[in-house]
Amino acid sequence: MKIGINSIIGVTTVATVMSCSSAKKEYASFELYPVRTGSLTEMEYTPEATKFTLWSPTAEEVRLMLYDEGEGGHAYETVKMELGEDGTWATVVNKNLLNKFYTFNVKINDKWQGDTPGINAHAVGVNGKRAAIIDWKATNPEGWENDQRPPLKSPADMIIYEMHHRDFSVDSTSGIKNKGKFLALTEHGTMNSDKLLTGIDHLIELGVTHVHLLPSYDYASVDETKLDENQYNWGYDPLNYNVPDGSYSTDPCLLYTSDA
């Protein structure tokens, strides 16, 4: 999911905790890398504290960078992370970080490699450069915990429709309000100028039972701050695999959930 806050670009004080000594790990092959144990989650939020973890066994140092905004501005705090036995770096920040943003900064071969939201980020700011700190329970639509897929007796019963989010609804005659957006899949009763069904209702009348979505994750080539410009890509240039792309949202800076 995409989440963001209107950016206020400015200079802030950076509090940095530096390491007195660097961890140096060398491995003869990938097979010798330690295997991460436990959850792959890189951010675990509670109002009292947030735990951050990053699996990076070859890193010499890892820093957590905290931001007020999803883009622009500077990190307001830098926190040293500690290395565990399985190659995972971790730290806990004992304060309420709800709606803040973060990146990891990794040093390898005595060189800082730049910022990353982590490969397991599930919420990011505009254009996916920083991960977002959110309360997962608060993002679920009402009744989400009771949602169940329709029963399927046999895979042979499936009638599959391959769909690209933008192409499915973007046509000017589609009769769909949220053209090219995720919300287009929630609209019913839409018709074109010839009074023919469009959108989800058209798939239903075709007898489609399953929809195969072309890439929906966050990809790099579309600038989500310039959606009024003519930008297009099918999405085969992934940036954050576990985050829906912001260009398909009605506003990349806002959070909306729907159980449709």
Predicted regions and their residues:
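C-terminal motif of bacterial Sec signal peptides marking the signal peptidase cleavage site
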Residues: 18-19
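The feature marks proteins involved in alpha-glucan
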Residues: 23-47, 83-187
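Conserved small/polar residues in nucleotide/adenosyl-binding loops
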Residues: 256-260
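Conserved, mostly hydrophobic/aromatic
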Residues: 54, 163, 213
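Structural beta-strand segments of beta-rich domains
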Residues: 48-52
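Bacterial N-terminal signal peptides that target proteins for export
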Residues: 1-8
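Short proline/glycine-enriched turn/loop motifs at strand-loop junctions of beta-rich domains
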Residues: 56-61
